[in-house]
Design a protein with these regions (language model features):
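Amphipathic HAMP/coiled-coil signal-transducing linker helices
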Residues: 29-46, 60
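Allosteric cytosolic regulatory segments
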Residues: 14-21
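Catalytic core regions of nucleotide second-messenger enzymes
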Residues: 114, 143-160, 170
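Conserved long alpha-helical elements within nucleotide-processing catalytic cores of c-di-GMP signaling
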Residues: 47-70, 80-104, 113-117, 121-122, ...
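Catalytic-core segments of nucleotide cyclases and related cyclic-nucleotide turnover enzymes
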Residues: 7, 129, 133-137, 152, ...
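Residue-level recognition of strand-loop junctions within catalytic nucleotide-signaling folds
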Residues: 25, 84, 124-127, 144, ...
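Signal-transmission coiled-coil "S-helix" linker that connects upstream sensory/regulatory modules
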Residues: 14, 27, 31-34, 52
Length: 178
């Protein structure tokens, strides 16, 4: 036949290709959906569910290769005032912008997650507690010097409290570190 196909073969090949294409699209959608389950809706960074898995993974890695690991706990000071004064929409925008600022302060190999509310956690791979404290101080200063946009363009200044825990000195597992 035409193009070397027997009658009906071209239709079958076209149908098989269409099914394969659909299967690939479904697989991609599933993968994206699964990934979305680990992303915080407001800030677009990882959520607490992902953080728990990532902490387990990083602790195992630190143990296996005898490498340090630091965990930073960040809590915005008096963030309730931002929500009360400017509304939750502005509060969400501030949290989203804060997430961007935090991402700029860490390496790509580090993990930033919104733990909940106005709390964030950062996993610093291959980083001891001493270096973790220096990074925490740099983040604290950066946030304090960043102007966040409030309602009506009014600038909002934030301060942040940061705790640092190191593996293995402060904890040898997720429970001890978080």
């Amino acid at each position: 036949g035409e193009l070397g196909f027997e009658p009906g073969e071209l239709e079958r090949a076209t149908a098989i290709a269409a099914h394969a294409n659909l299967a690939l699209q479904n697989s991609e959608r599933y993968s994206q959906g699964k990934e979305r389950a680990f992303i915080d809706d407001v800030t677009e960074v990882y959520n607490a569910r992902f953080l728990l898995q990532a902490t387990d993974r990083e602790v195992q890695r630190a143990e296996r290769y005898a490498k340090p690991l630091s965990v930073l706990f960040l809590d915005l000071d008096r963030f309730k005032n931002v929500n009360d004064r400017h509304g939750h929409l502005v509060g969400s925008q501030v949290l989203r912008r804060l997430s961007q600022v935090l991402k700029e302060c860490i390496r790509q190999v580090d993990t930033l997650a919104r733990y909940g509310g106005d709390e964030f956690t950062i996993l610093l791979a291959d980083t001891g507690a001493e270096a973790g404290m220096q990074i925490a101080e740099r983040i604290r200063r950066t946030v304090a010097h960043t102007l966040f946009e409030g309602g009506g363009g009014e600038p909002i200044r934030l301060t942040i409290s940061i705790g640092v825990a190191g593996f293995p000195e402060h904890g040898r597992d997720r429970t001890g570190l978080l």
